[in-house]
Design a protein with these regions (language model features):
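Extracytoplasmic gate region of multi-pass secondary transporters
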Residues: 31-32, 215-255
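Helix-to-loop junctions at the C-terminal end of transmembrane segments
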Residues: 64-75, 266-277, 364
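Cytoplasmic helix-loop-helix junction between adjacent transmembrane helices
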Residues: 106-147
Length: 402
């Protein structure tokens, strides 16, 4: 591990990484609320729109495999900022795309650079923050999801309605410039992982990671968590409108309430995990998440206040699992291979995300009245994956001194 940072510099590092992660998460999240606008603008089907979402995840998975061959060969800060700059250019290309296919290609590039970048953010936390504070530090960076939910979705819709669908992407590109400048000034160089011994084969770092059975267990655990969430998440909005009867105008309230709640609870869960033990806290939060996983997929009608309460509990607990889980996963890596491992983890998560969304799409259907059918079956799949993850986490060994 790199030498400990002074408290002030550690805070600068975490807030800067949180800003970079915010840009990345916001770029991914705005696609779903922009769906109706893009479908009308390009005259495409819902399936074609689904490709715009899926290409991001699968490109991130492919870039993760490629990134695993070189990520531990470079100093962390420079590689992160380089990927961040390319991500910003790809996002700007999304905003300037003249048609559907050019937007599809631009989304693929954004996913490719974003996939490596997201892994590097967690890698730098693992390299710079001691084990005893790692979950709390991770919760601060994970708060980017909550801020994106609270501010990103409403702002993206407001900009799109005020100008057009291109405005949110241009807005994110401006954010990238701001956070890239901050990163250049505030992020420390991290090169402790660099080995004096040169590895001949470009896939040597990946092979070294995959030789460790503990790494395989951590990757399987990561896939289970993502799979259990993303069988449900992509279809919550559609189910809310068509089955529960929530107005399209009230959908931002779901994200606002859920994001605000997770913004508060994320830090509390991170502190709790550092104090009581990451595995114990993960199991408790994941077990509690079984309730909203069941309710969200089985409730057939509800007033707005009750549905918002259910979805808020879903956001808090399902995303809350990720805070101790990411600390466990990061600590499972051999320190000298952490960059490669976290890149492979990002690939694993992206594949799990794409496969979960695809499987759920095969299970559910829409009847003649427009209602979503068999969403409850998707819930059972998610609950099963969550239960397996609760059992499986105990098999992962953490490197507590690094």
């Amino acid at each position: 591990m790199n030498p400990p940072l002074p408290p002030r510099q550690e805070k600068f590092l975490l807030f800067t990484l949180a800003g970079i992660q915010f840009s990345h998460v916001l770029d991914f999240m705005i696609m779903m609320p922009l769906g109706p606008i893009l479908i009308a603008e390009f005259g495409i089907s819902t399936h074609a729109f689904g490709l715009l979402v899926a290409v991001y995840s699968f490109s991130a998975a492919a870039s993760g495999l490629l990134g695993a061959t070189f990520v531990d060969r470079f100093e962390r800060r420079n590689l992160l900022l380089g990927m961040f700059a390319l991500f910003g250019l790809a996002t700007l290309a999304c905003g300037l795309a003249p048609g559907y296919f050019s937007l599809l290609i631009a989304r693929g590039f954004a996913g490719a650079f974003g996939g490596v970048m997201g892994a590097l953010v967690h890698t730098m936390i693992g390299d710079a923050i001691p084990f005893e504070r790692r979950a709390k530090a991770g919760s601060l960076v994970s708060a980017a999801f909550s801020v994106s939910t609270v501010a990103g979705v409403p702002v993206s819709l407001w900009l799109a309605n005020l100008f057009n669908w291109r405005a949110p992407f241009i807005f994110i590109a401006v954010l990238v410039i701001m956070f890239a400048v901050a990163g250049w000034k505030l992020l420390p160089q991290l090169r402790h992982h660099l080995s004096a011994e040169k590895q001949r084969h470009p896939f040597a770092p990946m092979f070294n990671v995959l030789r460790d059975a503990n790494h395989w267990r951590a990757l399987a655990f990561s896939a289970l968590i993502i799979f259990s969430g993303f069988t449900i998440i992509p279809y919550i909005t559609v189910y809310s409108v068509h089955n529960i009867g929530i107005s399209q105008h009230d959908i931002p309230l779901i994200y606002l309430a859920g994001g605000t709640a997770t913004l508060i609870t994320a830090r509390l869960i991170g502190h709790w995990a550092d104090a009581r033990g990451k595995v114990e806290v993960y199991r408790r939060v994941a077990f509690a998440a079984l309730l909203p996983l069941f309710v969200i997929t089985h409730l057939t009608s509800a007033p707005l206040w009750l549905w918002v309460a259910c979805t808020t509990l879903f956001f808090v607990l399902v995303s809350g699992r990720m805070i101790p889980a990411m600390a466990i996963i990061t600590s499972a890596a051999q320190p000298r291979l952490r960059g490669t491992f976290m890149t492979l983890n990002a690939t694993t998560q992206a594949l799990a995300m794409g496969l979960a969304t695809t499987l759920a799409g095969f299970i559910i259907s829409q009847d003649e009245a427009g209602l979503i059918v068999d969403y409850s079956m998707v819930g059972y799949v998610a609950i099963t994956a969550n239960l397996v993850a609760i059992w499986f986490v105990g098999r992962i060994v953490m490197h507590k001194r690094h």
